[in-house]
Amino acid sequence: MLRVAVPNKGTLSEPAAEILSEAGYRRRTDTKDLTVVDPANNVEFFFLRPKDIAIYVGSGQLDLGITGRDLAAESDAPVRERLALGFGSSTFRYAAPAGRDWAPEDLAGRRIATAFPNLVRKDLAGRGIEATVIRLDGAVEISVALGVADAIADVVGSGRTLGLHNLVAFGDSLCDSEAVLIERDGAGDENAAARDQLAARVQGVVFGQQYLMLDYDCPRHVLDRATEVTPGLESPTIAPLADQDWVAVRALVPRRDVNSIMDELAAIGAKAILASDIRFCRF
């Protein structure tokens, strides 16, 4: 039976459960449940703390897991990323008191508070910077005001929380994170087919969230220009219409770009442009 780790709480929990449900797997009915057996798919799900999931997978106790890329990197567990899931995006950056221009080199000899000490130490070592890293499990932003640290390294969203504590982010991102499906680095043939099947199902759901199917009628004389705008994954589908001067075109397009793509098609003469949701896809 395939053994899969799923976040039991936090921002990754519900989207992960939703994707697995859309992929045809059983959901837990009580948030207190720590395991759920799905006999129809021969899978057992374990609901664990997101920060611990990479450790369980890396040890070989579990076959697959869903966690954050930053959490997997911080764990230093021997895991590899199988698939990016398209939710839970964040950046991990340094921040320090506002009022001056900061650079990573300014951290030399200073105290840095973070919930991700391994990530920070690796980054500092790569830059040749010596600093004191202080591990905190939460509310890292307040550490500077309380005199515990001179700077922090933390997940940064809009920057609003940093601003409330008179901090400003600086330097490049230490880690651009999102939810990922992971497996043990060097995982062998055991349960390989089952791992592949779950990954394919999940990838199909993720793809359906990121792409749309676009259908439109196109004058033949601008078909080359139209297919440059909508090349599809491999190639667009082109079918004749009753009017021989026109063809029907169907192609997958990125959801985030659909409005600009429709604008371009309309500008070159395409008609009846229709965007449709897709739920699943297999490659």
From Swiss-Prot:
GO terms for molecular function: ATP binding; ATP phosphoribosyltransferase activity; magnesium ion binding. CDD domains: PBP2_HisGL1. Pathway: Amino-acid biosynthesis; L-histidine biosynthesis; L-histidine from 5-phospho-alpha-D-ribose 1-diphosphate: step 1/9. This is ATP phosphoribosyltransferase. Its EC number is 2.4.2.17. Feedback inhibited by histidine. Gene3D superfamilies: 3.30.70.120, Periplasmic binding protein-like II. PANTHER family: ATP PHOSPHORIBOSYLTRANSFERASE, ATP PHOSPHORIBOSYLTRANSFERASE ATP-PRTASE. Disulfide bonds: none annotated. It is an enzyme of class 2 (transferase). It comes from Mycobacterium sp. (strain KMS). Its cofactor is Mg(2+). SUPFAM superfamilies: GlnB-like (SSF54913), Periplasmic binding protein-like II (SSF53850). It catalyses: 1-(5-phospho-beta-D-ribosyl)-ATP + diphosphate = 5-phospho-alpha-D-ribose 1-diphosphate + ATP. PROSITE patterns: ATP_P_PHORIBOSYLTR (PS01316).
